[in-house]
């Protein structure tokens, strides 16, 4: 009996993350996703496959997440995935403590393609363009997906961790 109490907990059991209220709502309504651990502020985080982003984003909008506060990219390191991150907020009369959720879509480095959420939240316009410009994440269906910070002829994606910056870049027609 004493030996059984000292047995280590299997990693699969230790890694179980409790679902937050929004994740539970998505599960009840048949949306495929995975709950990740909440951040230090208690914001619920879910992982979504790229193919399911638009249906889930539409459902979250209908559920009351009417404001895309932030969309950005993350590079997990050379040879690893890129992540498209969406921070959504329920803006309502209860402005003291709005409900928030973060949606993460993990994408293969070789072909980082995800549907654009521009048609759900217009605030995604420049944010998706910046993620494209800096990380090379392609947002299918975006109405104007082109570089926003770097010159159009820039080669590469400057915020990728495996990016090698050129020794010299000539500015043309600078004045």
UniProtKB/Swiss-Prot annotation:
Superkingdom of source: Bacteria
Molecular functions (GO terms): NADH dehydrogenase (ubiquinone) activity; quinone binding
Recorded family membership: Belongs to the complex I 30 kDa subunit family.
Gene Ontology CC, one term: plasma membrane-derived thylakoid membrane
PROSITE patterns named among the record's database cross-references: COMPLEX1_30K (PS00542)
Localisation per UniProt entry: Cellular thylakoid membrane
InterPro entries listed in its UniProt record: NADH_DH_suC, NADH_quin_OxRdtase_su_C/D-like, NADH_UbQ_OxRdtase_30kDa_su, NADH_UbQ_OxRdtase_CS
This protein's encoding gene: ndhJ
Pfam family, one: Complex1_30kDa
The protein's name: NAD(P)H-quinone oxidoreductase subunit J
Principal location class: membrane
Catalyzed reactions per annotation: a plastoquinone + NADH + (n+1) H(+)(in) = a plastoquinol + NAD(+) + n H(+)(out); a plastoquinone + NADPH + (n+1) H(+)(in) = a plastoquinol + NADP(+) + n H(+)(out)
Subunit structure: NDH-1 can be composed of about 15 different subunits; different subcomplexes with different compositions have been identified which probably have different functions.
Single biological process term from Gene Ontology: photosynthesis, light reaction
Function: NDH-1 shuttles electrons from an unknown electron donor, via FMN and iron-sulfur (Fe-S) centers, to quinones in the respiratory and/or the photosynthetic chain. The immediate electron acceptor for the enzyme in this species is believed to be plastoquinone. Couples the redox reaction to proton translocation, and thus conserves the redox energy in a proton gradient. Cyanobacterial NDH-1 also plays a role in inorganic carbon-concentration.
UniProt EC number: 7.1.1.-
Membrane topology: Peripheral membrane protein
Keyword list, A-Z: Membrane, NAD, NADP, Plastoquinone, Quinone, Thylakoid, Translocase, Transport
Transmembrane segments: none
């Amino acid at each position: 009996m004493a030996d059984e109490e000292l047995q280590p907990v299997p990693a699969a059991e230790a890694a179980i993350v409790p679902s937050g209220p929004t994740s539970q709502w998505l599960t009840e309504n048949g949306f495929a996703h995975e709950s990740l651990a909440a951040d230090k502020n208690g914001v619920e985080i879910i992982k979504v496959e790229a193919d399911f982003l638009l249906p889930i984003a539409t459902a979250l909008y209908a559920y009351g997440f009417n404001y895309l506060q932030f969309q950005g990219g993350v590079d997990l390191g050379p040879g690893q995935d890129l992540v498209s991150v969406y921070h959504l907020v329920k803006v309502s009369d209860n402005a003291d403590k709005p409900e928030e959720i973060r949606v993460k879509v993990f994408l293969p480095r070789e072909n980082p393609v995800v549907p654009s959420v521009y048609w759900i939240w217009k605030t995604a316009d420049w944010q998706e363009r910046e993620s494209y410009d800096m990380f090379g994440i392609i947002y299918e269906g975006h109405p104007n997906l082109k570089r926003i910070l770097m010159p159009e002829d820039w080669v590469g994606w400057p915020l990728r961790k495996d990016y090698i910056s050129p020794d010299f870049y000539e500015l043309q027609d600078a004045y």
